[in-house]
Amino acid sequence: MSQLMGIITRLQSLQETAEAANEPMQRYFEVNGEKICSVKYFEKNQTFELTVFQKGEKPNTYPFDNIDMVSIEIFELLQ
């Protein structure tokens, strides 16, 4: 399974968990133990929120309404 498919699988699991819990759920993505980004899924409006962590800077947050687009963004961040 490619890394991109692994990311999509994790995001689909995040969606399913959020739907069952009825509250926003969050997942972290790391490289060599360093947090690169986190993703929250909001069931109410069916959107993802990507937070990108950069050393020495304030985290940047980006909204996505498409699982494919947020998956590609995460994939690029992890490269």
Curated annotation (Swiss-Prot):
Keyword hit for Signal: yes
Keywords recorded for this protein, A-Z: Signal
Domain of life: Bacteria
Disulphide bonds in the chain: none
Keyword Signal: yes
Alphabetical list of InterPro entries matching this protein: YkuJ-like (IPR014904), YkuJ-like_sf (IPR038073)
Signal peptide from the UniProt entry: 1-20
Database matches in Pfam families: DUF1797 (PF08796)
Protein name as it appears in the record: Uncharacterized protein YkuJ
